[in-house]
Regions:
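Active-site core of metal-dependent hydrolases
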Residues: 171-244
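Conserved phosphate-binding/catalytic loop of the ribokinase/pfkB sugar-kinase fold
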Residues: 146-171
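Active-site mouth loops of central-metabolism enzymes
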Residues: 72-83, 152-159, 202-206
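N-terminal metal-binding scaffold of metallo-dependent hydrolase/deaminase domains
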Residues: 4-47
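Divalent metal-dependent hydrolysis catalytic cores, especially in the metallo-beta-lactamase
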Residues: 71, 87-116, 132-146, 173-185, ...
């Protein structure tokens, strides 16, 4: 199937369902130039092209997804601490429509986490492979969490939130750490911690047993995210809403 319209060096993908800003799928096509979407069109307005047209066979076309919390895939874990593992993770994610990632760490010893973060920073600087999802950031799930809600995290490595250690993480990652989880009830210094680092990293409530009052104070201090809401936190009830 061919259409004809002078549009130099463009790629046209026709016969797809495009996810639009009004949250609807509309049948049409996409015109790409270089790495950018130049235009989209509805099927009823299909122009004529002189370039080759690729038939999308009725596939759904959506913006690239961003995964902010996962630990690995296809046998590789972000905490393997190798550039090769990160590369394989990023390539697989891109193959399923995820174009940017912020993989999560586990609760490990501080020095081990620093090494993992350093490796990620090196990978970020060196990677040029367009087939891979962009390493947008890192989501630190611990070590500043609650033993009572540790889940699969290793309790031996759990410590209270600490500004100096957080700064070490930020330095090791060259600023790539974008989220850091804390259990605010585990330290009297939690509010000061949040106020100290909130301009450098997003503070999450994660693996926490905080009650409503403690969680509210943390959010008012600058925390802005909750990790896997409802999971690894107190159950929601009308008398004790907790973090939720």
């Amino acid at each position: 199937k061919k259409f004809y319209l002078r549009r130099e060096n463009a790629m046209i993908i026709d016969n797809v369902y495009i996810y639009t800003p009004d949250k609807k799928f509309v049948k049409g096509g996409i015109i790409l130039k270089g790495e950018q979407i130049q235009a989209v069109y509805e099927a009823k307005d299909t122009p004529k092209f002189e370039e080759e047209v690729f038939d999308g066979n009725g596939a759904y076309a959506i913006p690239g997804l961003i995964d902010l919390h996962f630990h690995g895939c296809k046998g590789d874990d972000f905490c393997d601490g190798t550039k090769e593992a990160i590369g394989r993770i990023a390539e697989y994610e891109a193959s399923i429509g995820v174009t940017a990632i912020a993989p999560a760490t586990m609760t490990l010893p501080v020095e081990e986490l620093e090494h993992i973060l350093e490796v990620a920073a090196e990978y970020k600087k060196e990677n040029t492979d367009k087939r891979r999802a962009d390493l947008l950031g890192i989501n630190m799930e611990g070590p500043f969490i609650s033993p009572a809600k540790k889940g699969a995290q290793d309790e031996r490595n759990i410590i209270p939130c600490n500004v100096e250690i957080c700064e070490r993480f930020l330095k090791a990652s060259d600023g790539l750490v974008k989220f850091i989880g804390i259990a605010p009830e585990e330290s009297e210094e939690a509010i000061d911690f949040i106020k100290s680092v909130k301009g450098k990293v997003n503070v999450s409530l994660a693996h926490t047993n905080a009650d409503y009052k403690t969680a509210k104070a943390a959010f008012e201090a600058g925390a802005n995210h909750a990790v896997h809401l409802y999971n690894a936190m107190p159950p929601f009830s009308h008398r004790a809403p907790g973090v939720v």
